[in-house]
């Protein structure tokens, strides 16, 4: 039985980079990992495979949407450290529903029996959209992980995601493993002061603190995980540490997790406004 993670967060927050590095850390610790990109721009697995791979929707179009004609090799690419990558893809811009494609991808994975092949399946899910198909990974996830930065918009999105996780937990097993503080900079922006208070307020914790560092950005543009970068890069160890920390907690199979207690949409403006 695979351990299933669903990674969410505000658009542009660094989910795909974070997801790829978590997958790499897990794989290098011996886990067989499948990362599933759930975004129409289909670049989640780029740091793992080094290319924009064929999407599930493209593969389905080639067989006129006959699921039974596809095999895992048609939709799965193997990349860094033996990690398998899959991209759900999406309809053309301005038409169709991207969430539907995510739901179709989940169905296809179940039909192919891929859940039994992996130690960890990681869903990297589009932004803070938690309606319809984009919330589907929460139906299958053991744990949700929220990526956030130390600002109001990110915290507001994280709170909305907590609402979705709380709602899904009524019918499904999903719990919130915690929040990954991304692009942490103690020289400006308060470090993690706002995120620390938010995590306490909703009953969760910070899983790790990823520093704001040019090397992380550099690795993304190079189409690599941090773990594939030159080991002589300055401060590489500091950048790798939080991802290894997350992987160790996940592989312990008993990460501290809970059902979050989100703040009301209107209430959060008053509460966050009073934080220092």
UniProtKB/Swiss-Prot annotation:
Q: Where does [4Fe-4S] cluster bind?
A: 97, 131
Q: Spell out the Pfam families in the cross-references.
A: Fer4_NifH
Residues binding Mg(2+) are: 16
Query: Which cofactors must be present for this protein to function?
Result: [4Fe-4S] cluster
Which reaction is catalysed here?
chlorophyllide a + oxidized 2[4Fe-4S]-[ferredoxin] + 2 ADP + 2 phosphate = protochlorophyllide a + reduced 2[4Fe-4S]-[ferredoxin] + 2 ATP + 2 H2O
Note how many cofactor molecules are bound and how. Answer: Binds 1 [4Fe-4S] cluster per dimer.
Gene3D superfamilies linked to this entry: P-loop containing nucleotide triphosphate hydrolases
| Pathways per UniProt | Porphyrin-containing compound metabolism; bacteriochlorophyll biosynthesis (light-independent)
UniProtKB keywords: 4Fe-4S, ATP-binding, Bacteriochlorophyll biosynthesis, Chlorophyll biosynthesis, Iron, Iron-sulfur, Magnesium, Metal-binding, Nucleotide-binding, Oxidoreductase, Photosynthesis
Name the residues that bind ATP. 12-17, 41, 182-183
GO MF terms on file?
4 iron, 4 sulfur cluster binding; ATP binding; metal ion binding; oxidoreductase activity, acting on iron-sulfur proteins as donors; oxidoreductase activity, acting on the CH-CH group of donors, iron-sulfur protein as acceptor
Gene Ontology BP terms: light-independent bacteriochlorophyll biosynthetic process; photosynthesis, dark reaction
> Top enzyme class of this protein?
oxidoreductase
InterPro entries xref list: NifH/chlL_CS, NifH/frxC, P-loop_NTPase, Protochlorophyllide_ATP-bd
Check the record and name the PROSITE patterns matching this protein.
Answer: NIFH_FRXC_1, NIFH_FRXC_2, NIFH_FRXC_3
- Assigned EC number: 1.3.7.7
Per the record, the similarity remark reads: Belongs to the NifH/BchL/ChlL family.
Protein function? Component of the dark-operative protochlorophyllide reductase (DPOR) that uses Mg-ATP and reduced ferredoxin to reduce ring D of protochlorophyllide (Pchlide) to form chlorophyllide a (Chlide). This reaction is light-independent. The L component serves as a unique electron donor to the NB-component of the complex, and binds Mg-ATP.
Its assembly, as annotated, is: Homodimer. Protochlorophyllide reductase is composed of three subunits; BchL, BchN and BchB.
> What name has this protein been given in UniProt?
Light-independent protochlorophyllide reductase iron-sulfur ATP-binding protein
Organism annotation: Chlorobaculum parvum (strain DSM 263 / NCIMB 8327) (Chlorobium vibrioforme subsp. thiosulfatophilum)
């Amino acid at each position: 039985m695979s351990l299933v993670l669903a990674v969410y967060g505000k658009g542009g927050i660094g989910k795909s980079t974070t997801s790829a590095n978590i997958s790499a850390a897990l794989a290098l610790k011996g886990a067989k990992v499948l990362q599933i990109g759930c975004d129409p721009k289909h670049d989640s697995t780029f740091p793992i495979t080094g290319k924009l791979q064929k999407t599930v929707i493209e593969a389905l179009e080639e067989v006129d949407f006959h699921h039974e004609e596809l095999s895992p090799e048609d939709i799965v690419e193997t990349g860094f450290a033996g990690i398998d990558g899959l991209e759900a893809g999406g309809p053309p811009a301005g038409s169709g529903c991207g969430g539907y494609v995510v739901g179709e991808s989940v169905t296809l994975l179940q039909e192919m029996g891929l859940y039994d092949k992996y130690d960890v399946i990681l869903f990297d899910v589009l932004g803070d959209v938690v309606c319809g198909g984009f919330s589907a990974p929460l139906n299958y996830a053991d744990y949700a992980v929220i990526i956030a930065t130390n600002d109001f918009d990110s915290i507001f999105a994280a709170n909305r995601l907590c609402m979705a996780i709380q709602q899904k937990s009524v019918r499904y097993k999903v719990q919130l493993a915690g929040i990954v503080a991304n692009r942490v900079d103690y020289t400006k922006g308060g470090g993690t002061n706002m995120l620390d208070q938010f995590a306490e307020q909703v009953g969760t914790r910070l899983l790790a603190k990823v520093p704001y560092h040019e090397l992380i950005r550099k690795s993304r543009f190079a189409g690599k995980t941090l773990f594939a970068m030159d080991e002589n890069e300055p401060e590489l160890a500091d950048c790798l540490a939080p991802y290894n920390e997350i992987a160790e907690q996940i592989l312990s199979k008993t990460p501290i997790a809970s059902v979050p207690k989100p703040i009301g949409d209107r209430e959060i403006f008053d509460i966050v406004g009073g934080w220092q």
